[in-house]
Amino acid sequence: MKILVIYNPQAGGGRAKALLPDITAYIEAKGLDATIISTNYSGHAVEIAANAKLDDYDAIIASGGDGTLFEVLNGYYQNPIQASKQNKPPIGLIPNGTGNAFMRELNLSATDWKKAIDIIAQNNPRLLDVGRFTTENKTYHFLNIVGMGFVTDIAEASLPLKWMGNTSYTVATLLKMIFLKSQKMTIEIDGKCLERDGVFIEVANSRYTGTTFFIAPEAELDDGKLDIIILNKISRLKLLRVFTSIFDGTHINYPEIEYIKARTIKVIEEKPGKLIPDGEILGSTPVEIECLHKDIEFLWD
């Protein structure tokens, strides 16, 4: 099995660099023929995946956090071989970053790189849905989630706290709660228009965000639908209670939360705000998002 591994040595606060020799040795021990390319800058994984000769490989592997997987996915969709719908290799994951939400779908932790390589060696692809969103006249793809509103404030605040690991998202949430505000949002879901005074919207393909937040407990990766979580205007005190319930998914029981499954969603905010797709700050509202049903293969356990 011939694989291309796009490796982010800066993942996990730079800890991934020290892991590379061990990961390389284990890949070889599993009998995999690997080409390993390390990324050198933000956006490099996009370029590598976009320019790779995909038909030379049996799988394309992202090794890093959710941001690395996001870049590899988007480079994959930019690749002319992928666009031709011929000889499309599956994607795989070796997690070793700070934010590793998608690995939870594979029942992996950030230290489970050996188990991840075992999964890759099994060569058992599964068809998955992919989210596609258009913002600022550009189109991107995601496997995890796109957030807007208060969640982008949290993401920005968590960046200088990445040294704290998964705790960075929790600390950032508590810090930004001081500045909590809602705003008017126009939301079109499968053609039906809603007007809301919202705090945030999350559009999820998978169940987790920020590794530990069980944001979309009913999400399925192959149902042809995205799970939309809308938090309407809420007090700081009640938001604190909602926040603590996100870890086990019971936040969806609060009346301020709307949980909707749909194929398409469009969002316009009264004051255009930034987007946070798969942990990356990229684009802004207005945004159009849709589900591409079973559009890629992903190496699964």
Predicted features, each with a name:
Residues M1-S63, N74, K192:
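ATP/NTP phosphate-donor binding region
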Residues K30, Q78-V199:
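Catalytic core of DAGKc-family lipid kinases
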Residues A45, G67-V72, F102, L128:
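Short glycine/serine/threonine-rich phosphate/pyrophosphate-binding segments
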Residues G147, V151, E202-A216, I281:
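Glycine-rich phosphate/pyrophosphate-binding beta-alpha loops
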Residues K162-S168, T212, P217-K238:
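Gly/Ser/Thr-rich active-site loops/lids in small-molecule metabolic enzymes
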Residues K181-Q183, D197-V199, D222-D227, K261-R263:
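A generic structural signal for short beta-strands and their flanking turns/coil linkers
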Residues I189, E195, E220, I230-D301:
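ATP/nucleoside-binding phosphotransfer catalytic cores, i.e., glycine-rich phosphate-binding loops
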